[in-house]
Amino acid sequence: MAVSRITRWRLMSMFFGIKCLFLIVALGVLVKNSFTIQNIQSTPSSTPIVEFQKVSKCCACLEKWIGHQCSCYFISKEEKSWKGSREFCASQNSSLLQLQTRNELSFMSSSQAFFWIGIHYNEERSAWLWEDGTFPSKDLFPEFSKFRQDHCIGYSISREISSESCENKNRFICKQLPT
């Protein structure tokens, strides 16, 4: 009887020993994976970084874009013609800025520069229109009758909106709605 008790205790000890060994190996694997994930997160990447904007929690914008009220804005540092600006914005899956609210105008007030925006004269409709074909708000913009129809529209806080030759090179703002 004493021999069977010793054998039973040895079997139980061996069973719990193997179980402990398995748990130690599993813990080691988890710790190793944890350090690997931390290293990946802290390693700089060559791909564009998506940053959630502090201003608005409903959108994420690419690096060098600014988030404001669920839209992303790219403010150029280089100058292009109106057409070149529009083409650049299109290549970024966006369009030239279409101002829709006074709040957006105040967002623009941080810069004194003149920027191309997305208003152009549509000869077929004999009207100034945004790129998407809608009319600019009369609350935000005065009459366009003072502008030459062969010119393009830009905006600056000091000049409000004004027209210039579309071939002039100016900075521009692209706007991208959330997808």
From Swiss-Prot:
Residues 68-175 form the C-type lectin domain. PROSITE patterns: C_TYPE_LECTIN_2. Keywords: Adaptive immunity, Cell membrane, Disulfide bond, Glycoprotein, Immunity, Innate immunity, Lectin, Membrane, Receptor, Signal-anchor, Transmembrane, Transmembrane helix. Its main location: membrane. InterPro entries: C-type_lectin-like, C-type_lectin-like/link_sf, CTDL_fold, NKG2/CD94_NK_receptors, NKR-like_CTLD. Glycans are attached at residue 93. The keyword Manganese does not apply. The chain crosses the membrane at residues 11-31. Immune receptor involved in self-nonself discrimination. In complex with KLRC1 or KLRC2 on cytotoxic and regulatory lymphocyte subsets, recognizes non-classical major histocompatibility (MHC) class Ib molecule MHC-E loaded with self-peptides derived from the signal sequence of classical MHC class Ia and non-classical MHC class Ib molecules. Enables cytotoxic cells to monitor the expression of MHC class I molecules in healthy cells and to tolerate self. Primarily functions as a ligand binding subunit as it lacks the capacity to signal. Residues 1-10 are cytoplasmic. This is Natural killer cells antigen CD94. It comes from Rattus norvegicus (Rat). Can form disulfide-bonded heterodimer with NKG2 family members KLRC1 and KLRC2. KLRD1-KLRC1 heterodimer interacts with peptide-bound MHC-E-B2M heterotrimeric complex. KLRD1 plays a prominent role in directly interacting with MHC-E. KLRD1-KLRC1 interacts with much higher affinity with peptide-bound MHC-E-B2M than KLRD1-KLRC2. Interacts with the adapter protein TYROBP/DAP12; this interaction is required for cell surface expression and cell activation. CDD domains: CLECT_NK_receptors_like (cd03593). Coiled coil: none annotated. GO terms for cellular component: external side of plasma membrane; plasma membrane; receptor complex. It comes from the Eukaryota. Pfam families: Lectin_C. Disulfide bonds join 58-70, 61-72, 89-174, 152-166. It is a single-pass type II membrane protein. GO terms for molecular function: carbohydrate binding; HLA-E specific inhibitory MHC class Ib receptor activity; MHC class I protein complex binding; MHC class Ib protein binding, via antigen binding groove; protein antigen binding; transmembrane signaling receptor activity. GO terms for biological process: adaptive immune response; natural killer cell mediated immunity; negative regulation of natural killer cell mediated cytotoxicity; negative regulation of T cell mediated cytotoxicity; positive regulation of natural killer cell mediated cytotoxicity; stimulatory C-type lectin receptor signaling pathway.
